[in-house]
A protein has these predicted regions:
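Positively charged n-region of N-terminal signal peptides that target proteins for export
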Residues: 1-6
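The feature marks the mature, well-folded catalytic cores of soluble enzymes
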Residues: 22-223
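Bacterial N-terminal signal peptides
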Residues: 7-15
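Sec/Tat signal peptide C-region and signal peptidase I cleavage site
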Residues: 17-21
Length: 223
């Protein structure tokens, strides 16, 4: 990974995407209860998540830029059907759409009644904690710039184990290798909303990534 530039970013982000009961529209910010639970969650992390063997990619990779073309868009379908319906309407014209839902028939009906074709839509009956898939979903990297497509993941910065399993679920569905920064010395607590790569070796992030990885220096995170 190229050098990470630590900056403060303020902007609008399109959100498509227990140690608590499922609350699909739950808080984006970490709650006081979750703050208290985070240390124990990290200590027992691999008990909470269903993962492949946590290893880093076998060689240099290029992280996909924020604005590069995508093969698929992922949504966690919750109690925001009007907004999510219109996201799907726009997305199916450009790419495949993968929807995580506990009720595929209901979602299918909503989309069909709105005149949205389902040819490019896949429903996965998988659990999740919240709507914020931008933060916990998979990220893609390429070997040799545009060669092999792989999925990468890290430890989500919320104690929400069902959310944290989504990258592995997507990797299994797409039959793609998944590599994870979840085991020392490469373990890394992070969130997709604080992860803005340019595709050329620079990753933009706020100082939050330093706060959430107190055992690592800026140089270690850069590397």
């Amino acid at each position: 990974m190229g050098r990470i530039q630590y900056i403060f970013i303020l902007g609008l982000v399109l959100l498509v995407t227990q140690v608590r009961a499922q609350d699909p529209n739950g808080s984006h910010a970490i709650t006081p209860e979750e703050q208290q639970a985070m240390a124990a969650y990290l200590k027992n992390y691999h008990q909470y998540t269903l993962r492949a063997t946590p290893v880093v990619p076998p060689g240099p990779v290029r992280t996909m830029a924020e604005w590069e073309p995508i093969q698929a868009l992922i949504l966690s379908w919750t109690g925001q059907p009007t907004i999510q319906r219109e996201i799907v309407r726009a997305a199916v014209k450009e790419c495949k759409v993968i929807i995580l839902t506990s009720n595929a028939d209901n979602v299918s009906g909503i989309l069909t009644n709105a005149g949205i074709p389902l040819d490019s839509v896949t429903f996965l009956n998988e659990p999740f904690n919240t709507i914020w898939v931008r933060d916990y979903g998979p990220w893609t990297v390429y070997k040799n710039d545009i060669d092999s497509l792989w999925i990468v993941d890290w430890i989500y910065n919320r104690p929400r184990p069902q959310d944290d399993q989504v990258p592995g679920i997507i990797a299994n569905y797409l039959n793609l290798p998944i590599y994870e920064a979840t085991q020392a010395p490469y373990d890394w607590v992070h969130t997709g909303g604080n992860h803005l790569p340019d595709g050329l070796g620079t990753l933009f992030s706020s100082n939050l990534v330093l706060d959430e990885n107190p055992g690592k220096s800026e140089a270690q995170i850069d590397s």
